[in-house]
């Protein structure tokens, strides 16, 4: 009960530097890509609360799907249908674009899912995909793997799609700050769960998180990037 109250409280801080994931709250890279998908039938795999739908160009036909176990039980998802990404309930060449954000790390068969995406895409159809890289295990036990940029490109192209863009989702210094903030947040949550004396340090952890977040954000604007260290990747591809 205490941990659920803590989670709700922390969620209220999501868009402030007090939140351990504040450095991830800027979705401009992904939302910018969503606006370029054009009209047509857009399939959103792992749609959760369907936030993608509001970011798409006017005139799109949107279909959101999610996996029942994680989508419904963990996130309260509201899809058009519950389905397995490795066995999509759509006809061949029936969609113009597929959006799959922070999902394939949770799939036991990501290669099969990418082949399914290629199957339902029309020739020339687009894929917009994002994945974490340097990021803690989450949604356990449904967190199975991480991909490097080279491994991700290989899997996409193996499925019959051509990568046109693959970029880090967060700079190196912001990623370093994010990891430290997540570690502090995770330890604070564990202290609450175990009812240990560590809860007394919660105010200091919150202060440290806010300082690290702001410092990392500013440093990221001033220092050159290093693509070997990133919280994740955003990829754009087309079906050949």
Regions picked out by a protein language model, each given a short descriptive name:
Residues 102, 106:
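A short His-aromatic
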């Amino acid at each position: 009960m205490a941990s659920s109250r803590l989670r709700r409280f922390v969620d209220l801080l999501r868009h402030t530097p007090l939140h351990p994931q504040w450095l991830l709250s800027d979705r401009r890279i992904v939302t910018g890509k969503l606006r370029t998908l054009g009209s047509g039938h857009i399939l959103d795999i792992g749609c959760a609360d369907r936030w993608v739908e509001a970011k798409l160009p006017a005139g799109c036909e949107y279909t959101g799907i999610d996996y029942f176990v994680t989508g419904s039980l963990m996130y309260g998802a509201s899809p058009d249908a519950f389905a397995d990404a490795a066995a999509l309930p759509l006809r061949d060449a029936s969609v113009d674009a597929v959006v799959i954000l922070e999902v394939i790390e949770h799939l036991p068969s990501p290669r099969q899912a990418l082949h399914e995406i290629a199957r339902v895409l029309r020739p020339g159809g687009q894929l917009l995909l994002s994945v974490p890289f340097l990021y803690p295990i989450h949604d356990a036990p449904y967190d199975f793997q991480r991909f490097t940029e080279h491994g991700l490109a290989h899997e996409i192209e193996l499925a019959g799609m051509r990568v046109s863009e693959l970029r880090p989702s967060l700079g190196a210094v912001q990623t370093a700050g994010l990891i430290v903030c997540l570690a502090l947040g995770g330890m604070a949550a564990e202290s609450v769960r175990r009812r240990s004396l560590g809860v007394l340090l919660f105010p200091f952890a919150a202060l440290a998180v806010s300082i690290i977040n702001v410092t990392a954000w500013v440093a990221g604007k001033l220092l050159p990037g290093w693509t070997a260290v990133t919280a994740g990747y955003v990829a754009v591809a087309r079906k050949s």
